[in-house]
């Protein structure tokens, strides 16, 4: 479900997309940017919020592999997608709601990543 939602959204944003025939290298799709470069995307589908405020995904198996450039997070209940440049981390947390203690420092907001990143 998430892969189709991401493909549709990227086409709507005007990108060319390519889907691997075999899912063996941790890449769900490849996006051709406006400058002609290609970016490898891993898609994660999330069905519920952790602690009621944030979408969280584990990325442990991608750390230090140099296999992906962007993580696309599809939050199914709201039918929304975030495109986060992969920074070689073991997990990703994107806030959808304000936390109970109103913490904002070092918090990444889901809606800040609605457009696919253009790399230089």
Regions found by a protein language model. Give the residues of each.
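Mixed-charge (Asp/Glu-Lys/Arg
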Residues: 1-25, 30-120
């Amino acid at each position: 479900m998430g892969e189709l939602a991401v493909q549709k959204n990227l086409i709507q944003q005007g990108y060319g997309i390519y889907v691997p025939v075999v899912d063996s290298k941790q890449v769900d799709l490849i996006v051709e940017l406006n400058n002609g470069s290609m970016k490898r995307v891993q898609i994660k589908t999330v069905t519920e919020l952790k602690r009621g405020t944030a979408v969280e995904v584990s990325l442990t198996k991608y750390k230090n592999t140099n296999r992906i450039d962007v993580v696309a997070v599809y939050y199914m209940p709201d039918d929304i997608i975030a495109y986060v440049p992969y920074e070689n981390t073991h997990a990703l947390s994107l806030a959808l709601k304000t936390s109970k203690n109103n913490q904002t420092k070092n918090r990444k907001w889901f809606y800040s990543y609605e457009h696919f990143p253009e790399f230089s």
